[in-house]
Amino acid sequence: MKYVVIFKAKIKTLDEQYFQTAQLLREKALSQFNCQKFEAISEQDFEIALSYWNSLADIQAWHHDAEHQVAQQLGKEQWYQSFSVEICKIERHYAHSVHSI
């Protein structure tokens, strides 16, 4: 993974359409657009999502996908008060895991 896209949003209202769309698009990004991993968390009225990618070309292709564009518009009109997107290059990665025997 070379890049991470950081999506941060202040939530207005999330309805059933949001949850269905989010699940569909997550699966589509992972299966059709070379997204390597996706993580998201919400707390009160704040949401943050991290998606990991190998290339800027894959990120751009995903951004321009027709279904993703519709969801972006719905986000602006219905689901979010505000949001921001940051695309960052991953220079290093560290991890630790404790395994039970």
List the predicted regions and their residue ranges:
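Short S/T/G/P-rich N-terminal loop/turn motif that feeds into the first structured element of a domain
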Residues: 1-47, 56-64, 81-101
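Low-complexity, intrinsically disordered Gly/Pro/Thr-rich segments
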Residues: 71-73
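Arginine/glycine-rich "motif VI" loop of SF2 helicases in the C-terminal RecA-like domain
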Residues: 75-80
